[in-house]
Amino acid sequence: MPLFKLGAKMPQVGDNAWVAPNATVIGDVRLGKNASIWWNATLRGDNDPIHIGDNTNIQDGSVLHTDEGVPMRIGENVTVGHLVMLHGCTVGDGSPVSYTHLTLPTKRIV
């Protein structure tokens, strides 16, 4: 799995979670059970943590990133579509995030 330590922070992967061989997961990232990170997706937990809930999938080419003081939480049973950029936000359980969506810090999607 393409998991990268940043400082003292190493991604944590839940049971049966899957990360595509060319995805990038770096730093303070926690993947829930049965989560999946698809081709060319990037999750950068470099400023604050990223939490991906159980049974959630981050589809191809999406980028998830945090700002200092603005962590990211993606709920359970969420589909983040292809080429989505999420930046320091919260996505509620079961929420779909459409293709090519852009969300800036502190926004909440429910």
Predicted regions and their residues:
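Domain-scale signature associated with acetyltransferase and cell-envelope carbohydrate enzymes
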Residues: 1-94
